[in-house]
């Protein structure tokens, strides 16, 4: 039984939201069944898990747009450090519906024509591919052979001043953990295939990360605000399994057993996050 349940989501349960709003229009705001409204709230998933497990402990949901999952992860780390519990279920999730896909495509977030996910990064154009997903982790402050990896450090930052500011924050983050970029076996970035946003990663790959093995992940899950949860799952399993899937590698060779992996992602160039994982 987890000692706490914490989730992060930017959109919440969109399918039920669309259903409820549609009924408001169709029924002229009269005689509306409340079920869809109740299930459309952002904390529905965390609440349903708690009800299923009969877990009456700390339960929280973070709705912080592009750093919703990281906020949940940070809250969990703080609870563990405070000794409130010794294991916490943490998850990041967002779903995509026909309605949300149509709206976000009109807003220019997604490409307006079909593109193979394996050709996402070679298709130089505006927009990315839509995605959705859910990834959950059981965090504990006790090391064991069952652990996938150790979450060494986490950092988020908002609207950096420019490329130099981003590089300073990354090097400062590593320095706080007594590391340099040369100590990192693999860097997983949130490259999305959108030329308006990938220039950040392009600049890093030729300057700060020029000697590092690089990997991408959004061609596997698509782009959505909490996709970093998928990246964390990918990184932790790469450390546990002592190998990196060839399908994610962009450049370089990785040690047979990567011991340190850095995950760097930004959403819309506004919300940035760094996650450092280490072998146990």
Q: What residue ranges belong to the model's regions?
A:
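Short acidic, glycine/serine/threonine-rich loops at helix termini
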Residues: 16-19, 99-104, 199-200, 273-276
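Conserved catalytic cysteine-centered active-site region
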Residues: 12-75, 107-128, 202-233
